[in-house]
Amino acid sequence: MVLSQRQRDELNRAIADYLRSNGYEEAYSVFKKEAELDMNEELDKKYAGLLEKKWTSVIRLQKKVMELESKLNEAKEEFTSGGPIGQKRDPKEWIPRPPEKYALSGHRSPVTRVIFHPVFSVMVTASEDATIKVWDYETGDFERTLKGHTDSVQDISFDHSGKLLASCSADMTIKLWDFQGFECIRTMHGHDHNVSSVAIMPNGDHIVSASRDKTIKMWEVQTGYCVKTFTGHREWVRMVRPNQDGTLIASCSNDQTVRVWVVATKECKAELREHEHVVECISWAPESSYSTISDATGSETKKSGKPGPFLLSGSRDKTIKMWDISIGMCLMTLVGHDNWVRGVQFHPGGKFILSCADDKTIRIWDYKNKRCMKTLNAHEHFVTSLDFHKTAPYVVTGSVDQTVKVWECR
């Protein structure tokens, strides 16, 4: 590459300035003489530190070029394997693809939870701004706001029909909403602190809630009465989730444990203690995942002939763990997130696990091989929640950046 006379002159002056300002006096005077430079004060100012500046900007550009090259390669891969042009993927293997289809703004504070409606093409989001918002995920349209809570809404849950929505809040209440008329039909009081999690039981006639008051409570939908209290956690209970048939509930806590409870007797069936920090989130494995789990863990089907149940947990220790509840053992630990794990869920097809974290990413795990197969830089800030639609190819995420993003899967 040939430099023009002007460029050569600039380079020589920059080198001369570098030699002089770093104390290479002898080299400076020889170089100045050989390059026939007449340095004066005006020029000196202009070329002060120029060589270092050019040097660092070249390094910065190189780094940027490498980043862009790797993004380009990723995009090429997407194009050949994921697009409609390349090989057809089985829907069981569809995963979210960047960029997001929609980035929706409306909440005025961090988004705390995002969930899909079980029937209609809507999703619901909860936020620290004390509101619940309803959106159409296919068009990206905002539909309405449900107001009633007086403090941060922490969690939301539909019943299986999608006619009822439960919500819980730092205002210490749980509310039940008629999702057809969008009205609050019941408010439940009983917890003594922030209610951090809520879930409607599979049969639809009870609700479970978890609170910073260290308890889990079960409520009757019909009357709003508290019918059971589960005690055992030693700190704030972060999340509670019933299993598919509603005979068990799992909970996780600041006490670094995951507990599984028998609903009928309130007995704690398992206390799982391998995390080294607050356990933020849990999720039951769907039956579609059982064969992959057996392959991954080499666990033979038990004497009873039925594997599982299995549970996932995500923690501030940055790991995700998979547990076999029948034996109370950790089957695997997935390591890769660089910050607190805030959401974890099985892919409906059962082959993958999705997680989101305070490292601002969503990760897709091929857990059979215990590896992270894809990382999406999802938001500008911590990713607090994610949901994978059970039948449509969509994932939704919520973040402290106050946005909700809809991702298409293919």
Swiss-Prot record:
Coiled-coil stretches: 56-82
Quaternary structure and interacting proteins, as annotated: Can self-associate. Component of the cytosolic PAF-AH (I) heterotetrameric enzyme, which is composed of PAFAH1B1 (beta), PAFAH1B2 (alpha2) and PAFAH1B3 (alpha1) subunits. The catalytic activity of the enzyme resides in the alpha1 (PAFAH1B3) and alpha2 (PAFAH1B2) subunits, whereas the beta subunit (PAFAH1B1) has regulatory activity. Trimer formation is not essential for the catalytic activity. Interacts with dynein, dynactin, nde1 and ndel1.
Residues spanning the membrane: none
Disulfide bridges in this chain: none
Biological process (GO), any one: cell differentiation
Entry protein name: Lissencephaly-1 homolog
Residues covered by the LisH domain: 7-39
GO cellular component annotations of the record: 1-alkyl-2-acetylglycerophosphocholine esterase complex; centrosome; cytoplasm; microtubule; microtubule associated complex
Entry GO MF terms: dynein complex binding; protein heterodimerization activity
Subcellular location: Cytoplasm, Cytoskeleton; Cytoplasm, Cytoskeleton, Microtubule organizing center, Centrosome
Gene that encodes the chain: pafah1b1
Protein keywords: Cell cycle, Cell division, Coiled coil, Cytoplasm, Cytoskeleton, Developmental protein, Differentiation, Microtubule, Mitosis, Neurogenesis, Repeat, Transport, WD repeat
Protein source organism: Xenopus tropicalis (Western clawed frog)
Role: Regulatory subunit (beta subunit) of the cytosolic type I platelet-activating factor (PAF) acetylhydrolase (PAF-AH (I)), an enzyme that catalyzes the hydrolyze of the acetyl group at the sn-2 position of PAF and its analogs and participates in the PAF inactivation. Positively regulates the activity of the minus-end directed microtubule motor protein dynein. May enhance dynein-mediated microtubule sliding by targeting dynein to the microtubule plus end.
Renumbered ranges of WD repeats: 106-147, 148-187, 190-229, 232-271, 274-333, 336-377, 379-410
Domain comment, as recorded: Dimerization mediated by the LisH domain may be required to activate dynein.
InterPro entries linked to this entry: Coatomer_complex_subunit, Dynein_regulator_LIS1, G-protein_beta_WD-40_rep, LIS1_N, LisH, PAC1-like_LisH-like_dom, WD40/YVTN_repeat-like_dom_sf, WD40_repeat_CS
Matching Pfam families: LisH_PAC1, WD40
